[in-house]
């Protein structure tokens, strides 16, 4: 019997409660054994002052999932030289773990962009895409996507960074403490 592992990719700048809820709901609704959080590189053209470094983002993720045995972090995309595509990452993971079915979890806001993903026609044969239903987003694409439901949330990392003074309710307590301690996103 194959293992069932969820992958939740993102910049996680910062990781917040909606990321945690997405992972929890996917694990519960799909019967996944574990969830791998896959932090992405921030493209050089997006790396502006006020954004957290790779190490800071990984540290915040570790704080967020601390004590949850079925949640882990995979940093391979941060370590890869050059461009990092989901296709390459999943090809490597499947090669390393041929006894595993991977479920790639994406927010409802990302589903409509799937046709633009690198090697998407091959990628949809390699993994099961899981779209987190959000009423405000179009989730119809020409690919089979497993849909899971999650209560509507308006939390986004961008909004948190832009309004850091009022962000504590959207962040795990340890992540909020880390942001204050390290004065990230302008938090003094």
Swiss-Prot record:
Q: Which CDD domains match?
A: NMNAT (cd02165)
Gene3D superfamilies membership: HUPs
Q: Which SUPFAM superfamilies match?
A: Nucleotidylyl transferase
Give yes or no: UniProt keyword Nucleotidyltransferase. Answer: yes
Describe which pathway this protein belongs to, using the record's wording.
Cofactor biosynthesis; NAD(+) biosynthesis; deamido-NAD(+) from nicotinate D-ribonucleotide: step 1/1
Could you tell me what reaction this enzyme catalyses?
nicotinate beta-D-ribonucleotide + ATP + H(+) = deamido-NAD(+) + diphosphate
Tell me yes or no: is Transferase among this UniProt entry's keywords: yes
- This entry's Enzyme Commission designation comes to 2.7.7.18
Reading the lineage from the top rank, the first entry is: Bacteria
Alphabetic keyword roster = ATP-binding, NAD, Nucleotide-binding, Nucleotidyltransferase, Pyridine nucleotide biosynthesis, Transferase
What function does this protein fulfil? Answer: Catalyzes the reversible adenylation of nicotinate mononucleotide (NaMN) to nicotinic acid adenine dinucleotide (NaAD).
Protein name according to UniProt: Probable nicotinate-nucleotide adenylyltransferase
Species, as recorded:
Listeria monocytogenes serotype 4b (strain F2365)
